[in-house]
Amino acid sequence: MAFSSLSPLPMKSLDISRSSSSVSRSPYHFQRYLLRRLQLSSRSNLEIKDSSNTREGCCSSAESNTWKRILSAAMAAAVIASSSGVPAMAELNRFEADTRGEFGIGSAAQYGSADLSKTVHSNENFRRANFTSADMRESDFSGSTFNGAYLEKAVAYKANFSGADLSDTLMDRMVLNEANLTNAVLVRSVLTRSDLGGAKIEGADFSDAVIDLLQKQALCKYATGTNPLTGVDTRKSLGCGNSRRNAYGSPSSPLLSAPPQRLLGRDGFCDEKTGLCDVK
């Protein structure tokens, strides 16, 4: 009786083979569809078995367990067979590695604490790369792209960054003594607590860069040239000779470059006792 109830299962599988192409072209959707049909098939077969047991009363609980194991094995085999067309995770990871970086828009290379001294990496793409605490002494990075890269605490003594794109980079606490920044673009870069003593900055663009006040004053003593890419004068990008002080101050030294503070009372008016009410 148990074997006679197996006949509906091949009939269902034939229906699946004919209609699978119309349900979905994706192997994943076909797998879900196949599982659903198998579940419905198992339910119908169990109902048939229950009705036959009611009529004849010849099937025991052992036969019922055997029938369930047969259905489970059939469903497992169907799942394994249908999953052969689904791309493996290894293939997806390989595709992501080929695109490089976050959403394929950068190198995301890792050079943290790496020894890159006296190496040549000119005209390369280091966008969003990590150079934290890297040794970059006397290396050649001319013409390379560092847009959005991390260079905190890197040592770049006498390194060549001429013509490089260093915009939007984090370069705080860097050692850039005697580094070559000729015609480099450092727009919106963060250079707080970095040492640029003796650096070559002819034609460099420091527009909206965050630089310590004392470091900026030292660079303004010999800043010259115009950046060939942005057309911005180096002295103008540093704010050299500007009589107008920054109203907000520099993040590294707000009290030195910002206007004197006006102390307000609890009601929002200036406290005459402070002596700062007449400050303009």
Swiss-Prot record:
It comes from Arabidopsis thaliana (Mouse-ear cress). InterPro entries: 5peptide_repeat (IPR001646), Thylakoid_lumenal_pentapeptide (IPR053285). GO terms for cellular component: chloroplast; chloroplast thylakoid; chloroplast thylakoid lumen; chloroplast thylakoid membrane; extracellular region; thylakoid. This is Thylakoid lumenal protein TL20.3, chloroplastic. Residues 1-59, 60-90 form a transit peptide. It is found in: Plastid, Chloroplast thylakoid lumen. Keywords: Chloroplast, Plastid, Repeat, Thylakoid, Transit peptide. Residues 124-163, 169-208 form the Pentapeptide repeat domain. It holds the Pfam family Pentapeptide.
